[in-house]
């Protein structure tokens, strides 16, 4: 009977690694490749063993990572008491108005409708329901009538929003500890919304029908100049960078590095979006920790669709003004039927051709885009990777397996990286994203290892930091492959 390496055998055999005969790095790599091939062979991949394998495997970076979406609901609930807020037990929303909170606290306990987090934790039924509102927990095994998954996903941010920007230093420390625990050395997190202001006249002008391109550029230039001369607005940018610096103090060390993207919300008014972009680009140009700019928010809602091309022109304008600032854009996070077909025909192409995106987030509607092959060729030739988020693409869009455009990107040579998106909302890990990839698509160890390296190569890190982490990744993989090779040898001594 052929002896197979099981997860239990691998775990037991790791104790033999320290005394195993030293093998060459190349032979260790070959042994690891053979071991991995056995895990994905056949009709049913060995997912438990893949989970162990990827938990152990060094992972370079997580490049599509929303800070607020990465924090688990349990930690947000802890922050409710820290901020002296309460949670409405009927709506499950956080009440931050101090007068309302004080009035609730003055009532007898039986009459309160707004509870402390301690009281929520003590009520098992209420706590379970809150977790289902504040994350996607139990969605697939819950029998009640539910809102659609995309609504459920995006609604979570409204529940924990009042505390999402509090205690950021604690939040980043938690994310660092969790990353180190799963052998992840770098996170590039979409951290905080950049400041913005409203300008009704600007909104009316840029949304005017038939506005010539030159007129739009003039409007953008004029308002940029006004914003640069606005002392209050400039102070808000300085305060933004101060918050990044204070929150991130002590995060970077020999084992872990984190960098930050400023982001704008695509469903706000044009003046709010553009002023937020101006602030984000300025912040990134001044602070080496802020390595890029992103645009986020549900792409399928009316304002996001209406203003998509306008937003790309705004990015183009600011990219010219700040050529060294990198941009990673959520583009094509759409599924057939979400919007009319013409709405799926150009988003990725405009992000690449107009905005000048350095990375594309999601890129899910590529099969429906005009000149999809041409766009993918440009992405391949310009080394513009796609940030692939398998869990959220399945949950929000209902797209997985062979329906996922990762099959197209792989076929046509477009680089891609594996990332988490919102691991706290989806209650997931980067290791599990690799498990999903390996179990759903035919792959080999060489591709898996390349993906780990690419998640650093395509990061927005300064070149010196990038080379430092790549060198460290070499050493980490050498140790990992030696472990796997030794465990493989040791497992042959273990009876099945």
Regions found by a protein language model. Give the residues of each.
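Gram-negative bacterial Sec-dependent N-terminal signal peptides
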Residues: 1-21
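Metal-cofactor-binding active-site regions of metalloenzymes
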Residues: 23-496
């Amino acid at each position: 009977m052929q002896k197979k390496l099981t997860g239990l055998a691998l775990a037991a055999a790791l104790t033999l690694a320290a005394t195993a005969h030293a093998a060459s790095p190349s032979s260790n790599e070959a042994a690891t490749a053979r071991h991995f091939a056995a895990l994905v062979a056949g009709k049913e991949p060995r997912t438990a063993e893949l989970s162990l394998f990827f938990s152990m495997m060094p992972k370079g970076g997580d490049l599509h990572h929303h800070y607020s979406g990465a924090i688990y609901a349990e930690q947000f609930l802890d922050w409710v008491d820290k901020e002296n807020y309460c949670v409405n037990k009927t709506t499950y929303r956080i009440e931050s108005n101090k007068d309302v909170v004080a009035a609730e606290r003055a009532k007898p306990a039986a009459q309160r409708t707004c509870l402390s987090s301690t009281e929520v934790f003590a009520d098992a039924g209420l706590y379970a329901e809150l977790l289902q509102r504040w994350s996607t927990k139990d969605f697939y095994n819950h029998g009640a009538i539910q809102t659609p998954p995309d609504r459920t996903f995006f609604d979570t941010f409204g529940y924990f929003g009042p505390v999402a920007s509090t205690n950021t230093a604690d939040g980043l420390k938690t994310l660092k500890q969790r990353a180190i625990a799963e052998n992840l050395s770098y996170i590039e997190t979409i951290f905080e919304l950049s400041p913005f202001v409203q300008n009704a006249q600007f909104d009316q002008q840029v949304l005017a029908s038939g506005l010539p391109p030159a007129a739009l550029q003039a409007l953008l230039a004029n308002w940029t100049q006004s914003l640069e001369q606005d002392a209050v607005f400039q102070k808000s940018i300085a305060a933004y960078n101060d918050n990044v610096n204070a929150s991130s103090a002590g995060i970077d060390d020999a084992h872990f590095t984190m960098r930050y993207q400023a982001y704008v919300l695509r469903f706000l008014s044009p003046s709010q979006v553009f002023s937020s972009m101006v602030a984000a680009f300025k912040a990134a140009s001044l602070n080496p920790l802020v390595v890029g700019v992103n645009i986020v928010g549900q792409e399928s809602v009316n304002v996001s669709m209406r203003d998509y091309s306008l937003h790309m022109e705004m990015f183009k304008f600011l990219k010219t003004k700040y050529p060294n600032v990198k941009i990673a854009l959520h583009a094509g996070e759409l599924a057939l039927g979400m919007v009319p077909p013409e709405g799926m025909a150009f988003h990725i192409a405009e992000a690449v051709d107009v905005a000048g995106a350095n990375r594309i987030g999601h890129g899910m509607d590529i099969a429906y885009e005009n000149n999809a092959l041409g766009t993918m060729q440009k992405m391949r030739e310009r080394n513009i990777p796609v940030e692939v988020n398998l869990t959220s693409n399945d949950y929000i869009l209902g797209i997985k397996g062979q329906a996922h455009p990762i099959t197209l990107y792989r076929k046509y040579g477009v680089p891609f990286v594996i990332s988490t998106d919102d691991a706290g909302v989806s209650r997931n890990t980067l290791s599990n994203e690799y498990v999903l990839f390996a179990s759903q698509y035919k792959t080999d160890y060489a591709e898996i290892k390349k993906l780990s390296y690419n998640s650093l190569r395509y990061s927005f890190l300064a070149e010196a930091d990038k080379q430092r982490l790549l060198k460290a990744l070499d050493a980490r993989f050498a140790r990992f492959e030696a472990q796997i090779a030794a465990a493989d040898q040791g497992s042959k001594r273990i009876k099945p």
